[in-house]
Amino acid sequence: MVKVYAPASIGNVSVGFDVLGAAVSPVNGELLGDCVTVEAAAEFSLTNTGRFVSKLPAEPRENIAWQCWERFCQEIGKTVPVAMTLEKNMPIGSGLGSSACSVVAGLMAMNEFCGKPLSDDRLLTLMGELEGRISGSIHYDNVAPCFLGGLQLMLEENNIISQPVPCFDEWLWVMAYPGIKVSTAEARAILPAQYRRQDCISHGRYLAGFIHACHTRQPQLAAKLMRDVIAEPYRTKLLPGFSEARQAALETGALACGISGSGPTLFAVCDKTDTAQRVAEWLKQHYLQNQEGFVHICRLDTAGARVLG
């Protein structure tokens, strides 16, 4: 029996649309992510459990965990009969890399169970492919950090999909999910087909400056450069209360605040525990919209997906 945990992730991290992603885990030790368990069986079966199980597709073959098993077997050239259990702890359409969690945990669990026939690079390629089935296009900014951990920059050159970017251990990432759904497809459709030259220049400056500041250990500069001119100006209209929440977080002392992935989850970066707690409390009171919403104070998850048992 193999059980794999795959952590939540922040796609884009404001400044790196489709090319930056960060894995996060709550500081209190709670698991913010999905688990997949695989054990030997006479034939394949899939069982769904977890807090958000009701949000999964009713048709089993539409479940991404089923598709992970099917694609993995196709890749290794044989059918592996297993009993698979998906523990769905992540809300769907949350901007926390929910589908990436299921994909990463599912493929990694199968690979571990079968004695690691696939390399990490090949696994990551398959993860991007399967994630693309859900979001409509192949992008690695959730699956790469979820699988490998930390802050990852997508390169997709010289057979390198992503590489780690050094980040700041003192940073706390306050994650607030309001309890509503925003589909990735809808959030992409709202973006313009073309951008002004000035926005392109600003985007290049912010992203290059952020990566430089990370490598040269300048946390204040890095946080200042976490600006999004590509998606946030357009997506805020899909996120009730985001602009007010962002302003409140910054006024409370957050170094930066942005949309996690395509939303509706937001993240706020703080460098002091008491600031993070105050930001978290404000978000609990004002940004959450129903009982499904939650706020977690997190750190970067540098381990990525891992075997729990």
Curated annotation (Swiss-Prot):
Main subcellular location of this protein, as a coarse class: cytoplasm
EC assignment: 2.7.1.39
Molecular function terms from GO: ATP binding; homoserine kinase activity
Keywords for the protein's UniProt record, in alphabetical order: Amino-acid biosynthesis, ATP-binding, Cytoplasm, Kinase, Nucleotide-binding, Threonine biosynthesis, Transferase
Family: Belongs to the GHMP kinase family. Homoserine kinase subfamily.
Function: Catalyzes the ATP-dependent phosphorylation of L-homoserine to L-homoserine phosphate.
Protein name: Homoserine kinase
Taxon lineage: Bacteria, Pseudomonadati, Pseudomonadota, Gammaproteobacteria, Enterobacterales
